[in-house]
């Protein structure tokens, strides 16, 4: 193996640049050439490759987003499109590829491996919804951004004795909502994985006001329902002022946290060493603080298990 490629695919996440940097510097240390593939699998098929050096990745560690850019490219599920991508890799002399992204990106990495190009997947998504890993690159930064926003929302909520339903990202995974909800002292956390009772949540809010509290915060995972709809349901059971706030894509931006920089660096370094050992079709993860690998194929038949103890802790402190 003399030359490897790296791409980012799907939604961007803080820490992706740190992973690209780690891959590049580790590979160069081992005498390999590194090419960045811009715009994900779309760029792979188009042959949009750029050489990466220590000099052009070193200052990227503190930057959010991905300087290789990203794009969703569902066409890569087609066999003939995959073959075009493989032909581009052969044309550029690239022997293996590291893919950073979510579950859709892993399908692409597996396809490349099946076509004879060893590929390793790194979990890059703020949603933290990848099986067999406790952590995905960007999750901690997204939580910090959401928590900072909710801290500011609380200021205005308190000024007006108002309730805010704050919608956070995560798709069908409630990990951001649970972590941010606990960190921001939410009165209720609502996630797709657990049943909820809007009337009971309204009673919790009313009880808080009766006890002298001057605001209410409900953290709502996006996979549950629209924030405005939830607010309207809530107001059926309570005579209080309420607003809905959707944090949306701001959670993907910003400089990555220490945790995201360190873990992305460890994962990028590990991925290169896997390729040097001739391994492919693997997904890198982290469980109990330690790096692991699983066959990518296993991920498609599994579901991420969140830390629901956070929800239990919050409910014990807020319910009667």
UniProtKB/Swiss-Prot annotation:
MF annotations from Gene Ontology: 6-phosphofructokinase activity; AMP binding; ATP binding; fructose-6-phosphate binding; identical protein binding; metal ion binding; monosaccharide binding
Binding residue positions for ADP: 21-25, 154, 185-187, 213-215
Cellular compartments per GO CC: 6-phosphofructokinase complex
Cystine pairs: none
Superkingdom of origin organism: Bacteria
Keyword Cytoplasm (UniProt): yes
Pathway terms, separated by semicolons: Carbohydrate degradation; glycolysis; D-glyceraldehyde 3-phosphate and glycerone phosphate from D-glucose: step 3/4
Notes on activation and inhibition: Allosterically activated by ADP and other diphosphonucleosides, and allosterically inhibited by phosphoenolpyruvate.
Enzyme class: transferase
Subcellular location: Cytoplasm
EC number per UniProt: 2.7.1.11
A Pfam family per the record: PFK
Residues given in the record as Mg(2+) binding sites: 103
Cofactor(s) needed: Mg(2+)
Residue positions binding substrate: 125-127, 162, 169-171, 222, 243, 249-252
SUPFAM superfamilies tied to this protein: Phosphofructokinase
Gene Ontology process terms (BP): canonical glycolysis; fructose 1,6-bisphosphate metabolic process; fructose 6-phosphate metabolic process
Annotated positions binding ATP: 11, 72-73, 102-105
Active-site annotation: 127
Keywords from the UniProt entry: Allosteric enzyme, ATP-binding, Cytoplasm, Glycolysis, Kinase, Magnesium, Metal-binding, Nucleotide-binding, Transferase
Catalytic activity: beta-D-fructose 6-phosphate + ATP = beta-D-fructose 1,6-bisphosphate + ADP + H(+)
PANTHER family found in the cross-reference section: ATP-DEPENDENT 6-PHOSPHOFRUCTOKINASE, PHOSPHOFRUCTOKINASE
Annotated function: Catalyzes the phosphorylation of D-fructose 6-phosphate to fructose 1,6-bisphosphate by ATP, the first committing step of glycolysis.
Subunit structure: Homotetramer.
Family per similarity comment: Belongs to the phosphofructokinase type A (PFKA) family. ATP-dependent PFK group I subfamily. Prokaryotic clade 'B1' sub-subfamily.
Protein name, per record: ATP-dependent 6-phosphofructokinase
Organism: Lactobacillus acidophilus (strain ATCC 700396 / NCK56 / N2 / NCFM)
Gene: pfkA
């Amino acid at each position: 193996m003399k030359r490897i490629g790296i791409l980012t695919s799907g939604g961007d996440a803080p820490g992706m640049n740190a992973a690209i940097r780690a891959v590049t510097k580790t590979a160069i240390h081992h005498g390999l050439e590194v090419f960045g593939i811009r715009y994900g699998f779309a760029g792979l098929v188009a042959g949009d490759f750029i050489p990466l050096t220590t000099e052009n990745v070193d200052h990227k560690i503190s930057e959010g987003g991905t300087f290789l850019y990203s794009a969703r490219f569902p066409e890569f599920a087609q066999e003939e499109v995959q073959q075009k991508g493989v032909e581009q890799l052969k044309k550029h002399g690239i022997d293996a590829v590291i893919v950073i992204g979510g579950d859709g990106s892993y399908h692409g990495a597996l396809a490349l491996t099946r076509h004879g190009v060893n590929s390793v997947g790194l979990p890059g998504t703020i949603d933290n919804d990848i099986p067999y890993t406790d952590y995905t690159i960007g999750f901690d930064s997204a939580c910090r951004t959401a928590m900072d926003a909710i801290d500011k929302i609380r200021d205005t909520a308190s000024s007006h004795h108002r309730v805010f339903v704050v919608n956070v990202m995560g798709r069908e995974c409630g990990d951001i909502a649970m972590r941010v909800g606990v960190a921001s002292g939410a009165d209720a956390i609502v996630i797709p994985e657990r049943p909820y009772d809007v009337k009971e949540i309204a009673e919790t809010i009313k009880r808080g006001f009766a006890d002298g509290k001057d605001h209410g915060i409900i953290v709502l995972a996006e996979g549950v329902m629209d924030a405005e709809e939830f607010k309207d349901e809530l107001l059926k059971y309570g005579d209080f002022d309420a607003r809905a706030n959707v944090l949306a894509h701001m959670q993907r931006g910003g400089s990555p946290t220490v945790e995201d920089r360190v873990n992305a660096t460890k994962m990028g370094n590990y991925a290169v060493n896997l390729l040097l050992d001739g391994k492919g079709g693997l997904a890198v993860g982290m469980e109990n603080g330690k790096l692991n690998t699983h066959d990518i194929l296993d991920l498609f038949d599994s579901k991420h298990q969140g830390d629901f103890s956070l929800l239990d802790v919050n409910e014990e402190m807020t319910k009667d």
